[in-house]
Amino acid sequence: MPFAQVSPDVKICYELFGRLEDPTLVLLHGLGSQLLLWEEGFCTGLAAQGFQVVRFDSRDSGLSTKFPEGSAYTLSGMAADVVGLLDHLEVADAHIVGFSLGGMVAQHLAFSHGTRMAHVICVMSSSGNPDLPPPDAGALAPSG
């Protein structure tokens, strides 16, 4: 699989599906998983719908750069990795789908690099802000 040097100390492993000329869709996995979370059939299906699909191992997962145990890194650093990957691929803007922690990174991308995002979709995620109120109980209640 190819790698992108997204910063002096971070190398990201990624995989592409589809045609380079199609709109780019970047898939961000959650904590404790890797690019394989996004199954190949799912990625090829999206590519068949007219997207260039990018799945990648975020820092400290899969084949990407590992950091010493206990090292801290931030959502802004992880967002910068995505921007570095887009730069490496020469992609001006992309549709971003983030799952769990990937959704938190996607939200940070939308805030800090909004012009690079065509759309942002967050799946099973939160903002990570502990100062926000809890979800409304009515919204969590079963319907029907």
Feature-to-residue mapping (PLM):
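Helical cap/lid subdomains and adjacent loops of hydrolase enzymes that gate the active-site channel
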Residues: P133-G144
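Short, hydrophobic/aromatic-rich segments at coil-to-beta transitions
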Residues: M1-F3
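A structural alpha-helix within SAM-dependent methyltransferase catalytic domains
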Residues: C43, V83, F111-G114
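Conserved HGGG/HGGXW glycine-rich cap/lid loop of the alpha/beta-hydrolase fold
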Residues: V6-P68
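Conserved hydrolase catalytic core segment
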Residues: A92-P135
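Active-site loop/oxyanion-hole signature of alpha/beta-hydrolase fold enzymes
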Residues: S61-L101
